[in-house]
Amino acid sequence: MTNPIKLIIADDEMLIRTGLKIMLEASGNVEVLALAESGRAAFEACKEHQPDVVLMDIRMPESNGIEGTKLIKEAFPEVKVLIVTTFQDTEYIVEAVQNGASGYLLKDSSPDAILDGIKVALSGKVVMDTVISEALLTNTTVEKPATFDAEKWGLTPREVEL
């Protein structure tokens, strides 16, 4: 038997924390070490336990998931933080990933999808729900003007303008 995945779950709603715990432990390959109600509480739990992964909600009182992710990744860079939330806000997604999150899943994902996401994050890859990927691609445009060396091609300023 392989070692179970050691997990901390952070969500301000007790029903969600408990539901995720029951669902993931039923897989037989996950051990939930602690439940936390804020990002700071998840960070404190990481100090006490040595998790492989933290499942983190994004919007929580006291210390949200982005702040919690930043604290955890600064102190424990080897711990994977996976955001699991109902929010598809691209601003939160980008900020969470910039602060070290290994991915972003929606709470309405199937139990198998969440477990698969945990495994993918542990393998070092970024996890992104399809709905979130589409939102990022639709709402994010990169405006980069084309550049080239006009002198190299012997173009006048007017020719470059055209």
Predicted regions and their residues:
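Short amphipathic alpha-helix used as the core "switch/output" element in two-component signaling
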Residues: 44, 66-78
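Active-site residues of response regulator receiver
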Residues: 11, 57, 85
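Active-site beta3 strand of CheY-like receiver
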Residues: 49-55
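Acidic catalytic/metal-coordinating carboxylates
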Residues: 38-41, 62-67
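Regulatory hinge/linker segments at domain boundaries
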Residues: 137-161
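Residue-level signal for the "D+5" position in two-component response regulator receiver
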Residues: 16, 35, 61-63
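Short hydrophobic/Thr-rich beta-strand motif most characteristic of the beta2 strand and flanking loop
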Residues: 29-37, 45
